[in-house]
Design a protein with these regions (language model features):
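Acetyl-CoA-dependent GNAT
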Residues: 15-16, 34-99, 108-109, 114, ...
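Central antiparallel beta-sheet cores of small beta-barrel/beta-sandwich binding domains
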Residues: 67-71, 126, 131
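Terminal substrate-recognition subdomain of acyl/acetyltransferases
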Residues: 2-3, 159-189
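Conserved GNAT acetyl-CoA-binding A-motif
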Residues: 116-127
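A short beta-loop-alpha structural element at the N-terminal edge
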Residues: 8-23
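Conserved active-site alpha-helix within GNAT-family acetyltransferase domains
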Residues: 101, 105-106, 117, 130-148
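Helix-loop element at the rim of GNAT/NAT acetyltransferase active sites that forms part
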Residues: 22-39
Length: 189
């Protein structure tokens, strides 16, 4: 059955969302699927949200009056390399009790729209654990493909685990809008 994403609303993250971020990343499935550590600090999230990167966008999904998911769209690192200006990275996290209900799809749709139509990004990149089948399926749904495997990429629960490097190229890179063929009429003086 297809998930109904109309019950979700998306907005920019705000400094007051720090408790929801800490709560989301406290979920075992959430932190084990990211590079976050267990027992997240509310204070560290408060600081990060109070001083956001001006070149990034951090979004949240709300449902039933609560923040249940978050995602970020960031310039590819290192940001001072001009030859990588066309690329952006993204990350997404859904609270454990909301996974598989469409919040990730809603966020991915918003991130891809922002990247394609507002940032003019030609390439989106992400890293995902090779055993995170649900996330991989979500990314594939939005046109991401596996470009390679990072072996022993991160320590998770006492084991070194692999990740996939996934990317998506803009399917229809921006072009110039058609020119207006008529000259503007200027009043004679």
């Amino acid at each position: 059955m297809k998930n109904d994403t109309s019950r979700f609303s998306i907005r920019r993250a705000e400094p007051g969302d720090y408790q929801a971020f800490a709560s989301t990343f406290a979920g075992e499935r959430a932190y084990s699927g990211t590079l976050q550590m267990p027992f997240p600090s509310q204070d560290s999230w408060r600081k990060r949200l109070a001083e956001p990167d001006p070149n990034s966008v951090v979004l949240v999904v709300e449902a039933e009056g609560e923040v249940i998911a978050n995602a970020g769209l960031h310039p590819a690192q290192p940001v001072d390399i001009r030859r990588r200006r066309h690329a952006m990275t993204l990350g997404i996290t859904v609270r454990d009790d909301w996974q598989g209900k469409g919040a990730g799809t809603k966020l991915m749709s918003a991130l891809v729209d922002l990247a394609d139509n507002w940032f003019g990004a030609l390439r989106l990149e992400l890293t995902v654990y090779t055993d995170n089948a649900a996330a991989i399926a979500l990314y594939r749904k939005f046109g991401f493909t596996v470009e390679g495997t990072h072996r022993a990429y991160a320590l998770r629960d006492g084991r070194l685990v692999d990740t996939y490097a996934m990317a998506r190229l803009h399917p229809h890179p921006p072009s110039r809008a058609p020119a207006n063929d008529t000259e503007p009429k200027v009043a004679a003086t």
